[in-house]
Structures are given as structure tokens and as C-alpha cells.
UniProtKB/Swiss-Prot annotation:
Region (Disordered): 1-22
Family to which the UniProt record says this protein belongs: In the C-terminal section; belongs to the purine/pyrimidine phosphoribosyltransferase family.
GO molecular function, one term: 4 iron, 4 sulfur cluster binding
Function: Catalyzes the formation of phosphoribosylamine from phosphoribosylpyrophosphate (PRPP) and glutamine.
Pathway(s) the chain acts in: Purine metabolism; IMP biosynthesis via de novo pathway; N(1)-(5-phospho-D-ribosyl)glycinamide from 5-phospho-alpha-D-ribose 1-diphosphate: step 1/2
Biological classification of the source: Bacteria, Bacillati, Cyanobacteriota, Cyanophyceae, Synechococcales
PANTHER family cross-referenced by the UniProt entry: AMIDOPHOSPHORIBOSYLTRANSFERASE
Chain residues in the propeptide: 1-28
Keyword terms of this UniProt record: 4Fe-4S, Glutamine amidotransferase, Glycosyltransferase, Iron, Iron-sulfur, Magnesium, Metal-binding, Purine biosynthesis, Transferase
Protein name: Amidophosphoribosyltransferase
Protein's gene: purF
Residue stretches making up the Glutamine amidotransferase type-2 domain: 29-254
Cofactor(s), by name: Mg(2+); [4Fe-4S] cluster
Organism: Synechocystis sp. (strain ATCC 27184 / PCC 6803 / Kazusa)
First-tier enzyme category under EC: transferase
Binding positions (Mg(2+)): S317, D379, D380
């Protein structure tokens, strides 16, 4: 595909592992990059990815650069499963790029793990991508016309990397090549790209997926790029600012230089990052998302009050909103569900009795807290409703006399095509049923959702600055019909 021009050392091993779906929108991916000569960049990236583990649990990878030599290790599994200290010690360099993955385009297989590493005339590049393109068929055709047809993976991320490498091989530098390649790409992308020269961070013209800049305070600043500020905190970096929508930052030994993409548009940060995906200790718009989620809980209590004895949240994502609901309503807050944080994928089949009570592998109710009580249970979203029904049944079995559910987001009625894995529209319960019908199906005494107006009002920002297509179907980037049919949209054309 491209002439080899560097020493590419792949340190990969592992086997494919099937994906899975929960009764929630599945996380986006996490990206991390660091330029820090004389630092242990692989270890710092490991810890950064550890903080971003919630954004993707299927695979993890790190690529480090020592001049034109790149060491890349990636595999299926959690960050702690993929990397051992001995491996990290082998991965020396002045800069690193890392990724945690949940598949939104391309299936869950080892070959699709990132970073994607490619050779170019200027040396290798390693690309980590959070987001989803919506024009992969057109991009593939455009690359085929340039002679780029031998793809290794089934991901749109590799296609972006190929497009950049192609532009560089035609004579452009790293920044020019990246900007030119991205004119071919439509959709959501936050990219961190490692090169022998430095690291590049870039967000799509709408800024749908997040990307922030941090700095390690030394005599010479060492820059960090990450999906969320929590990844800066874990390595002791200081938050500087957000990479703006349509901005490219180039970090080298000379420092950080900002560039604009050829096309810019109104910023449209995914509002689900605020509600659910990003960690509550991450900062957006100068406040923690914990504070925002408490605020939407307070607003929810004002919009949809109900008389009850206790307010509780579904761990962990429903807790901040539940605390806010409690504060606004004056109804005491209590922990009524205990979460087993060590439940992961298992290949051991449960018994039929366990399947019937399957939620208790993850959440177990406190009977002495719930018995004889009227309960308000707060959660961040309902997608299919199956888990919600199991939780409600468990609460009733524990002695709750009434169960009222409050959801700190509007009904999810449309799938996401910009880097979050939601079900197709016919599988979304709120696209098929009214609120009253959903309440009956999940067996609650009452059900209410936060209004779209309330959700956006609580951001404190202009409502036009957020993508809320999953709630209203207004997609800021046109989604072709072919893309709407399947999240694994590259599988059929790369077999």
C-alpha cells in the first residue's frame, strides 16, 4: 500500500473476543497522547488509558515513538489485562499514543484494535480515533482511485490513517497531510496521531467527540491530549483548554501550534457525554460533570415530583442525579442497590435460576433499607428497558411498596451514528412505546423523563452547541441510508 520507510516493531498477541450489548448506550472510545521527552511515556499513557477505561473495554493499545522506530502493543481486553510492566518498560520513546476501544464501526476483533500504525515517506504514523465516519463507502472509493485498496482492518479509523499517509506520501507535511485527508471525511472524529516529529490532536468541524489539552509542569512543558480531563488528573497534568471544534493542534519540541481545518461548523458536543459517558470527575465548561448531573437531578425533581420515602440512584451513573433529586425534593437519599464492581465478561453459563435473577450478579438490593418504603429510583437513561424491569422486580422483592422511576435524560428515540453504539431504532423502547406503555412494561408505579429543554438548560450553554440527535432525530451531519442499516458497515465490503 505504501513503501516501507521505517522500523515498524509490532508487539501484538491475543485472540478475538466477541462483543456484547448492555441495556445502555455503549461507550465511545478513549484516546490519549503525550509528548514528553525523557519521561516514561508508555507508563504515563497506560495510566491515562486506565482513567479512560470506561470509554471502551473491548481492546487497548499503545504506540511509542523513538525517532522513526515505533513500538506498538495492542490486544483484546482491559488496559490492565493487555499491559504488564515488563512490556511497558520495552516501549521507550519521546511520545506515545493510546486507545481504549468499543466497536462502533468494525467488529470486535483483535485486528481492529488501535492505534492503527502505517508507514509513510516521513516515517510511521500511529492513529487513535474516537468517533464514527458516516461516509465510509465514499471514502473507500476515493482511496481506491488513489491505489489504496489493501486494508487490514474493518474500521473507519484505518481509512483515516490511510488517507493521511497517502497525502504525506504525495509530498505534504504532517499537518498539511492531515488537513487534506480530513476534507474527505464526514462524521465525528477526535484523533490523536503520533509521528516521529510529534503528536497531532484534531476534532471534527462540529466537535462532537471531546478532546482536551493538558501540560506536565516541567522546565519545558510536556503536553498531553486526552478524551477527558480525568486522564490528565491521574498523571498529574494540568488542564489547559479544550481542543476546539475544527481545530488541529501540532505538538513538537517547539511547543504547541494551532491550525484550523479547511471547514468549520457550529460546535455540537454530544450531550450524552454530559449525561452519561464521561466520568463524573471530568470537567466540561469549567465544572465537573458530577455537578452538572446533580443539577439535572434537581431539575428533574421540579419537573416530575412524586411523593415517596426514599430517593436512590442506579449505581454508578444514576447517583449524582439522584442526590440532586433528593436535595430538590427534600426526600431523603439512600443507597438501596450495591454494585459488584468486579463483574465483567464471563464464559461460565449461569443456571436458569440465576438467569431469572441475573441483575443480582451486578446489583444487589438492601432489604433493610427498602422494606416497606416507597422508592424513587433515578437512572440516566433507558434504552431497551430489560435491565430496568429486572431492577424494579428486585426492588419489589426486597420489600419496596412502590417504585417510581425518574430518568435524568429525555427518551432515547433515535440511534447514534457518531461514535456511540446504540441499538437500531426498532429496538429502542422509547421509539416504539409511549411513556405510559414503557412504565407498564418495566413494571413501575410511575415513570418520568427529564425534558429536552431541561437537559439543555442545565448545561448553562447555548442549546445549539450540543448534538442531541438521539433524543430528537436532528442529526448535524447527514447520515446516508446505508449507514443507518448497520453499525458494522464495513464488514460486507472487506471480506
Amino acid at each position: 500500500m505504501f513503501p516501507p520507510s521505517s522500523d515498524l516493531t509490532e508487539l501484538n498477541d491475543g485472540q478475538p473476543l466477541s462483543g456484547h450489548h448492555a441495556d445502555k448506550p455503549e461507550e465511545a472510545c478513549g484516546v490519549f497522547g503525550i509528548y514528553a521527552p525523557e519521561e516514561a511515556v508508555a507508563k504515563l499513557t497506560y495510566f491515562g488509558l486506565y482513567a479512560l477505561q470506561h470509554r471502551g473495554q473491548e481492546s487497548a493499545g499503545i504506540a511509542t515513538f523513538a525517532g522513526t522506530t515505533v513500538h506498538c502493543h495492542k490486544d483484546m481486553g482491559l488496559v490492565s489485562q493487555v499491559f504488564q510492566e515488563s512490556k511497558l518498560n520495552e516501549m521507550v520513546g519521546t511520545l506515545a499514543v493510546g486507545h481504549t476501544r468499543y466497536s462502533t464501526t468494525g467488529s470486535s476483533h483483535r485486528v481492529n484494535a488501535q492505534p492503527a500504525v502505517l508507514p509513510t515517506r516521513l516515517g510511521p504514523l500511529a492513529l487513535a480515533h474516537n468517533g464514527n465516519l458516516v461516509n465510509t463507502n465514499q471514502l473507500r472509493e476515493a482511496l481506491a482511485e488513489r491505489g489504496c485498496e489493501d486494508f487490514v482492518t474493518t474500521t473507519d479509523s484505518e481509512m483515516i490513517a490511510v488517507a493521511i499517509a497517502n497525502e504525506v506520501d504525495k509530498g505534504k507535511d504532517w499537518v498539511e497531510g492531515t488537513i487534506a485527508a480530513l476534507t474527505l471525511c464526514a462524521g465525528a472524529y477526535s484523533l490523536v496521531i503520533g509521528t516521529p516529529e510529534g503528536i497531532i490532536g484534531v476534532r471534527d468541524p462540529h466537535g462532537i467527540r471531546p478532546l482536551v489539552i493538558g501540560v506536565l509542569e516541567e522546565e519545558t512543558p510536556r503536553y498531553v491530549l486526552a478524551s477527558e480531563t480525568c486522564a490528565l488528573d491521574i498523571i498529574g497534568a494540568t488542564y489547559v483548554r479544550t481542543v476546539e471544534a475544527g481545530e488541529l493542534v501540532h505538538i513538537t519540541e517547539s511547543g504547541l501550534v494551532s491550525h484550523r481545518l479547511a471547514e468549520s461548523a457550529d460546535r455540537k458536543l454530544c450531550v450524552f457525554e454530559m449525561i452519561y459517558f464521561s466520568r463524573p470527575d471530568s470537567v466540561v465548561n469549567d465544572e465537573s460533570l458530577y455537578t452538572y448531573r446533580m443539577r439535572i437531578g434537581k431539575h428533574l425533581a421540579k419537573e416530575s415530583p412524586v411523593d415517596a420515602d426514599l430517593v436512590m440512584g442506579v449505581p454508578d451513573s444514576g447517583i449524582p442525579a439522584a442526590i440532586g433529586f433528593s436535595q430538590a425534593s427534600g426526600i431523603p437519599y439512600a443507597e438501596g442497590l450495591i454494585k459488584n464492581r468486579y463483574v465483567g465478561r464471563t464464559f461460565i453459563q449461569p443456571t436458569q435460576h440465576m438467569r431469572e435473577h441475573g441483575i443480582r450478579m451486578k446489583l444487589n438490593p438492601l432489604k433493610d433499607v427498602l422494606a416497606g418504603k416507597r422508592i424513587i429510583i433515578v437512572d440516566d437513561s433507558i434504552v431497551r428497558g430489560t435491565t430496568s424491569r429486572k431492577i424494579v422486580r428486585a426492588l419489589r422483592e426486597a420489600g419496596a411498596t412502590e417504585v417510581h422511576m425518574r430518568i435524568s435524560s429525555p427518551p432515547v428515540t433515535h440511534p447514534c451514528f457518531y461514535g456511540i453504539d446504540t441499538d437500531s431504532q426498532d429496538q429502542l423502547i422509547a421509539a416504539r412505546l409511549t411513556v405510559a406503555e414503557i412504565a407498564e412494561q418495566i413494571e413501575v408505579d410511575s415513570l418520568a423523563y427529564l425534558s429536552q429543554e431541561g437537559m439543555l438548560l442545565c448545561t448553562g450553554e447555548d442549546i445549539s452547541h450540543f448534538c442531541s440527535a438521539c433524543f430528537n432525530g436532528r442529526y448535524p451531519i447527514t447520515v446516508p441510508d446505508a449507514v443507518r442499516r448497520s453499525k458494522l458497515m464495513l464488514e460486507n465490503i472487506t471480506a
